[in-house]
From Swiss-Prot:
Cofactor(s) in the UniProt record: Mg(2+)
Family: Belongs to the shikimate kinase family.
EC code(s) of this entry: 2.7.1.71
Gene3D superfamilies noted in UniProt: P-loop containing nucleotide triphosphate hydrolases (3.40.50.300)
N-terminal signal peptide: none
Protein name: Shikimate kinase
Pathway(s) the chain acts in: Metabolic intermediate biosynthesis; chorismate biosynthesis; chorismate from D-erythrose 4-phosphate and phosphoenolpyruvate: step 5/7
Organism: Gloeobacter violaceus (strain ATCC 29082 / PCC 7421)
Compartments in which it is found: Cytoplasm
Protein role: Catalyzes the specific phosphorylation of the 3-hydroxyl group of shikimic acid using ATP as a cosubstrate.
GO MF annotation terms: ATP binding; magnesium ion binding; shikimate kinase activity
């Protein structure tokens, strides 16, 4: 279907990018890359540790450099970090493939991230609901630049199937005369 073109999943933390990404990679016969996990492997530090000790700017720079390396490859499903869309230069890397926004409402996101205390540095301390609303407010217009938008409110297998359906429809549109 994608003829080797990589797939980049964007969206808020808790939207299911990593879980859905693994399912999509399996269905497409692609490799899977979790960008945050790769950043941890390259840096030897947890994402939260980078945020805490070195700051978000250092993390975002590292994220861009790792994304640049990954974008040189094909036949990958890449689960990006929620803030990857914030840096303009990252869009150049993302557009080496097809960009899919896994979109979920705040209540769905909150329900998912509440089960992962301590793993979301941008939600540390304070009201998680309010912080998610703020982050989505900052990022929604950027996520909307994706090639395809898919509701991520369902269970991961259903979201993966819907993603494939939406991709097929979009690719059919693009190839129509």
């Amino acid at each position: 279907m994608l003829k080797g073109v990589s797939l980049y999943l964007v969206g808020m933390m808790g939207s299911g990018k990593s879980t859905v990404g693994r399912l999509l990679a399996e269905k497409l016969g692609y490799g899977f890359v979790d960008l945050d996990a790769l950043i941890e492997q390259v840096s030897g530090k947890r994402v939260g540790e980078i945020f805490e000790r070195e700051g978000e700017a250092v993390f975002r720079d590292l994220e861009s450099r790792v994304l640049a390396e990954v974008s040189a490859y094909t036949r990958l499903v890449v689960a990006t970090g929620g803030g990857v869309v914030l840096a303009r230069r990252n869009w150049g890397y993302l557009h080496h493939g097809v960009v899919v926004w896994l979109d979920a409402d705040i209540e769905t996101l909150l329900g998912r991230v509440e089960h992962e205390p301590g793993t979301r540095p941008l939600l540390a301390g304070g009201d998680r609901h309010l912080r998610l609303v703020e982050l989505l407010g900052e990022r929604a217009r950027l996520y909307a630049q994706a090639d395809v938008r898919v509701s991520a409110a369902g269970l991961p297998p259903a979201v993966a199937e819907e993603t494939l359906r939406c991709l097929a429809a979009r690719l059919a549109e693009d190839s129509a005369p």
